[in-house]
């Protein structure tokens, strides 16, 4: 039997990150979603990293069973939907069933790879009217060591009715999974995304990493059913380039500098972009 409890102070006060127990392949508690993999991630200084990474890059309450490279879980569902006016229908959201996931993750020589699927319910219940739909998501991720110095890695994700699991879609971390049309029916929204990157180990604790990520949500049916004005300011695509240099000046200390270019485009065609420089220092103890 093992028990893990971990917290940090990222929001300015103590928050619980992990709290779970494990016994004979059974895990119960809060930790990284089973619909998640880090094998295809490019190393970035930005805590939240690139759009399009594999699955839900968050921690959720769950019950999981692992046997060899296979793992299965029932998890706290993550979904959102918008009403016919284009507003968030969070107050009426129905989460009657857990999300169901299955993942395969393995490594052989210089290749690490992962694939997963997820299914969940997305719906609403106002007390007077209700409806729901089936949503699903899938991803693949891989990392290949080309030489002792160079690695290539990437991810691909597709969702339909599960855009909360399409990393960094929408205005923040996940776009709406569905919308309610004028007749009260739940209609799912699909999306896709991915990332690609390379890492170069320069030796002596020094490395260069560069990655690109992109996600896009298909709002065409929502525009047709709800009208362009209702979803005009919804985020249609997000993309980012991140490039960094990391070094270890002394044992247990990592420092780095990173350049980022970020761009977002809304359903109505309006867009914006930003450039920024990050500096980081990390002490491991």
Task: Specify the residue positions occupied by each region the protein language model found.
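Surface-exposed loop and membrane-interface regions of Gram-negative outer-membrane beta-barrel proteins
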Residues: 1-23, 27-29, 34-50, 85-92, ...
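Outer membrane beta-barrel
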Residues: 1-81, 96-97, 101, 105-109, ...
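Transmembrane beta-barrel strands of outer-membrane/channel proteins
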Residues: 5-7, 28-32, 72-76, 115-119, ...
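Residues that define the transmembrane beta-barrel architecture of outer-membrane proteins
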Residues: 14-17, 57-61, 66-68, 96-100, ...
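Outer-membrane beta-barrel "beta-signal"
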Residues: 247-249, 253, 273-285
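C-terminal structured domain segments
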Residues: 238-250, 254-258
């Amino acid at each position: 039997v093992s028990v893990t409890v971990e917290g940090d102070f990222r929001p300015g006060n103590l928050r619980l990150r992990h709290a779970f127990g494990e016994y004979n392949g059974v895990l119960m508690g809060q930790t990284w979603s089973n619909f998640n993999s880090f094998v295809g991630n490019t190393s970035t200084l930005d805590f939240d990293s690139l759009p399009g990474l594999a699955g839900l890059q968050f921690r959720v309450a769950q019950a999981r069973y692992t046997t060899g490279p296979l793992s299965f879980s029932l998890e706290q569902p993550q979904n959102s939907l918008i009403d016919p006016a284009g507003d968030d229908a969070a107050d009426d959201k129905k989460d009657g069933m857990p999300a169901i996931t299955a993942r395969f993750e393995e490594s052989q020589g210089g290749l690490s790879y992962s694939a997963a699927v997820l299914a969940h319910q997305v719906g609403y219940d106002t007390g007077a009217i209700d409806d729901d739909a089936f949503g699903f998501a899938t991803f693949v991720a891989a990392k290949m060591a080309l030489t002792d110095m160079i690695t290539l890695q990437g991810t691909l994700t597709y969702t339909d009715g599960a855009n909360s699991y399409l990393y960094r879609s929408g205005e923040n971390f996940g776009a709406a999974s569905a919308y309610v049309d004028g007749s009260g029916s739940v209609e799912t929204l699909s999306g896709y995304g991915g990332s690609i990157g390379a890492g170069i180990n320069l030796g002596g604790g020094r490395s260069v990493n560069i990655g690109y990520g992109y996600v896009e949500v298909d709002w065409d049916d929502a525009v047709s059913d709800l009208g362009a004005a209702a979803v005009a300011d919804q985020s249609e695509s997000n993309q980012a380039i991140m490039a960094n240099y990391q070094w270890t000046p002394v044992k247990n200390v990592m420092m780095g500098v990173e350049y980022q270019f970020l761009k977002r485009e809304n359903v109505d065609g309006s867009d914006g972009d930003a450039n920024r420089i990050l500096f980081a220092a990390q002490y491991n103890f």
